[in-house]
Amino acid sequence: MTRRYWNINLEEMMEAGVHFGHGTRKWNPKMAPYISAKRKGIHITNLTRTARFLSEACDLVFDAASRGKQFLIVGTKNKEADSVAWAAIRARCHYVNKKWLGGMLTNWSTTETRLHKFRDLRTEQKTGGLSRLPKRDAAMLKRQLSHLQTYLGGIKYMTGLPDIVIIVDQHEEYTALQECITLGIPTICLIDTNCDPDLADISIPANDDAISSIRLILNKLVFAICEGRSGYIRNP
């Protein structure tokens, strides 16, 4: 895998608060190599390590995107949901930003059935099929459609398991991470000072609570994916 320059700036990361970890009492000792200091009861992440692993992750997604691989971005906390959707749409990735439904990947056949139902209902709605049904039946199907849109809207075009999964919060998305591990799907994960750095294929030490931090990391990854995709389009 070729190493590239991704304009990862330590000052920019500091301004975004990427270096702020959790309180010193709430930490995982495995994170010690990624922590540079303690300040006012808070662990401070070593941004040099962050830059290194973020650069590795950008290289990985660029390489994968240039070969037409598919990505899934997962981040379901309310405050990060919009950023996850925006990043995914910008890079033409699939995403889950409301709730991870258990078995979404490990029980793919069930997910696929739900997606077929979702697509059928969307088609019925667009062609006016629902309006021709009795009111009670139409109302029930519209509720189903709304539910499916909420939880599966970000993966409605997914036709198979993703090649790489990007996870915004290890603790919040632990079930998703475990499903990826079970299936052998490579993962890139933001890890705060209370996380386990050994679980993901590439762990990026960063503040996973501040929106500014999450956006910065996602922006870099999305830019790398877009760059890779443009190369794939030029040389299919």
Swiss-Prot record:
The keyword Mitochondrion does not apply. SUPFAM superfamilies: Ribosomal protein S2. GO terms for cellular component: chloroplast; small ribosomal subunit. One of its GO terms (molecular function) is structural constituent of ribosome. It comes from the Eukaryota. Disulfide bonds: none annotated. It is found in: Plastid, Chloroplast. It holds the Pfam family Ribosomal_S2. The keyword Plastid applies. Its main location: plastid. GO terms for biological process: translation. Keywords: Chloroplast, Plastid, Ribonucleoprotein, Ribosomal protein. Belongs to the universal ribosomal protein uS2 family. This is Small ribosomal subunit protein uS2c. It comes from Helianthus annuus. The lineage of its organism: Eukaryota, Viridiplantae, Streptophyta, Embryophyta, Tracheophyta. The gene is rps2.
